[in-house]
Amino acid sequence: MSNWKTLLLRIGEKGPEYGTSSDYKDHIETCFGVIRREIERSGDQVLPFLLQCAEQLPHKIPLYGTLIGLLNLENEDFVQKLVESVHANFQVALDSGNCNSIRILLRFMTSLLCSKVIQPASLIVVFETLLSSAATTVDEEKGNPSWQPQADFYVICILSSLPWGGSELAEQVPDEIERVLVGIQAYLSIRKNSSTSGLNFFHNGEFESSLAEKDFVEDLLDRIQSLASNGWKLESVPRPHLSFEAQLVAGKFHELRPIKCMEQPSPPSDHSRAYSGKQKHDALTRYPQRIRRLNIFPANKMEDVQPIDRFVVEEYLLDVLFYLNGCRKECASYMANLPVTFRYEYLMAETLFSQILLLPQPPFKTLYYTLVIMDLCKALPGAFPAVVAGAVRALFEKISDLDMESRTRLILWFSHHLSNFQFIWPWEEWAFVLDLPKWAPKRVFVQEILQREVRLSYWDKIKQSIENATALEELLPPKAGPNFMYSLEEGKEKTEEQQLSAELSRKVKEKQTARDMIVWIEETIYPVHGFEVTLTIVVQTLLDIGSKSFTHLVTVLERYGQVFSKLCPDNDKQVMLLSQVSTYWKNNVQMTAVAIDRMMGYRLVSNQAIVRWVFSPENVDQFHVSDQPWEILGNALNKTYNRISDLRKDISNITKNVLVAEKASANARVELEAAESKLSLVEGEPVLGENPAKMKRLKSTVEKTGEAELSLRESLEAKEALLNRALSETEVLLLLLFQSFLGVLKERLPDPTKVRSVQDLKSIGAEDDKPSAMDVDSENGNPKKSCEVGEREQWCLSTLGYLTAFTRQYASEIWPHMEKLESEVFSGEDVHPLFLQAISSALQFPLH
């Protein structure tokens, strides 16, 4: 990398590029001297790279802003081009709805104001344009209130830029900035503060409790107003331009041209509730709230940090996580060395966990945060590991109130995190969970972590890791292997079923075809033993052959999948097939999930069969004590919607190729027609058309391009047919899913006249101090330590939690079918209010 590029990238950092100095002023002066000369040689390379640095290392924006201010003193044309590029990029970001670019570029423009590069009045115009758009959006008559998330986002962008230039704006244009803040207050007075209870990390049972709390926009305005009343003084934003103020004041101001905000879709003309809800969902998806604060630690763990400084550090951390997501070590390094004067390890941990647990989904996969936290623990060995451990303990204490989706992610993260540190954890602290009933959330949490660890390592290793709490071995999965029913025992005569299993195994070893196998089964086993025994023999034997490894399993399913398809052509029989798979792998949760997932992948079982099996009696009783049924259900839904997503991508790509083929075919025809219309001499006589060789080539080209276009159109039609079929099946799947949830909940939820909220449900168990029959551990019959919530109530809480989680996760696919779901499932007289509340909170949409 060129020296000038390295200087730009590493400005403000401790490193060899700037010698031993860590002073911002020295860095800026050194970089300015090099960049000034480089602009004369290759200004067209410097400008885009400088902009890229400012956008992708936004915690250094004050440094880049000051550098540009100094360049403005000597090369106004270069800076004018830069300002125009910033404006153009900002407009593109607005047009495309690129949230991160909009926010960062507005911060950058505010910083350029501090360096006397941008005219304050023109920045105020940008603010007011965004604010005007926001106010229009939430206006019932002129706008589309369903798109309030976009309006909120614009206001957040204005407020979030002020820590970087509010002082200068208050000094140079005090009336104008006051007008903007008053306008924001007016906006807040007309917008709706809708419930986001379905996106909360913790659920205390009060469905509308979040309405009484300040939301993110209101809270941010309070922080900015406190900052303004404090003279715009904060510790988290460097102000290097002050060191060059005497020089920068001589710079020429540059004007920002007007901007135009993106228009929202028109509100539904038919006043459809479902369509309005879908628009709101689309807006929330496009303009999601960046962070939901997770207050894990007590206030005394943080230094005396102003609320606005906390906000700025959160911005720094989220920016680094976003822009350096492909360079995890650089990411961790920057996160550990932010340009602030106070310690922030606790705030960093809270921010990271808020992203891991963020609902409806985090910006990145859990694995990314796992690696960043691991690197931070190594970069800050004396501080961060203890903070992370403290966060885990704090979350463990609140695990019974944690959202089910967030709880699952916490389990996945923590088990993976421990695998990076030799599975070391003071398990004796959590050994008390064995005294709790097997359905207690803390006990289930520890159990699921240990089972996940076994997947990431091996049984003996995990047993060794809990040697300080050996009793926890009870929560490990069974060490035994597959549950093969036809194993041969010495000294005992083979049963008829064992003989048939051995014969089937021999045929597999002889590599007989699936067709031959089907004929043999239909002639030998089925007529004598009937369907159930036949299915048991076939499933047990083939799975046993495939049990040696994942590759063996895949090979068996690929080679003999037709046998399963022939035996189980409909959903009823596929449910029985899944039950047999579960029986064979009853000692291995992971292999059960893998086998079922592969069978669905090969279309041996349908997603509807999996839903029916998950909600069958053998699994329903496990809903509150094991994650296995939910994992399998989630895998099936994921695979279903991944297929739809893949089909949509294929259709999009083929559509583009069709347009290209159309153009190529049209051009070929035009060229042929032009050639045919020309006169040429053949043996001295004028003939219509060019020479025969060229004409033959042109005709061949027309034929080939026409065939290519036709082939693509046929492929497009086939994909569209598959998509329509998949969407039709999805509607049936969703109806089955919600009907299944409704059915099992109806059987166990208390009378709706007595229980109308989750808090009511929890209070039932809390009021009853005496252990009931359900408070006895069914494994050994001994009474367990009392739990705040009884088993039946905990089953209801867990099932409602997963109902909310699945509804929220697949909301985009649910909305197109909302009217049918409302009419056929949600509107029945016997629908329990807790069932409707779970779905309403997930969709952020009231159900009546």
From Swiss-Prot:
Organism the protein comes from: Arabidopsis thaliana
Entry-linked InterPro entries: ARM-type_fold (IPR016024), CBP80 (IPR027159), MIF4G-like_typ-1 (IPR015172), MIF4G-like_typ-2 (IPR015174), MIF4G-like_typ-3 (IPR003890)
Knockout mutant characteristics: Stomatal closing and reduced wilting during drought due to abscisic acid-hypersensitivity in early abscisic acid signaling. Abscisic acid-hypersensitive cytosolic calcium increases in guard cells.
GO biological processes: 7-methylguanosine mRNA capping; abscisic acid-activated signaling pathway involved in stomatal movement; alternative mRNA splicing, via spliceosome; defense response to virus; long-day photoperiodism, flowering; miRNA-mediated post-transcriptional gene silencing; mRNA export from nucleus; mRNA splicing, via spliceosome
Ranges where the MIF4G domain occurs: 8-228
Highest taxon of the lineage: Eukaryota
Binding partners and assembly: Component of the nuclear cap-binding complex (CBC), a heterodimer composed of ABH1/CBP80 and CBP20 that interacts with m7GpppG-capped RNA.
Record's keyword terms, sorted: Cytoplasm, mRNA capping, mRNA processing, mRNA splicing, Nucleus, RNA-mediated gene silencing
Protein's recorded name: Nuclear cap-binding protein subunit 1
Known function: Component of the cap-binding complex (CBC), which binds cotranscriptionally to the 5'-cap of pre-mRNAs and is involved in various processes such as pre-mRNA splicing and RNA-mediated gene silencing (RNAi) by microRNAs (miRNAs). The CBC complex is involved in miRNA-mediated RNA interference and is required for primary miRNA processing. In the CBC complex, ABH1/CBP80 does not bind directly capped RNAs (m7GpppG-capped RNA) but is required to stabilize the movement of the N-terminal loop of CBP20 and lock the CBC into a high affinity cap-binding state with the cap structure.
Principal subcellular localisation of the protein: nucleus
Keyword Cytoplasm recorded: yes
Further information: In contrast to other organisms, the CBC complex is apparently not essential for nonsense-mediated mRNA decay (NMD) in Arabidopsis.
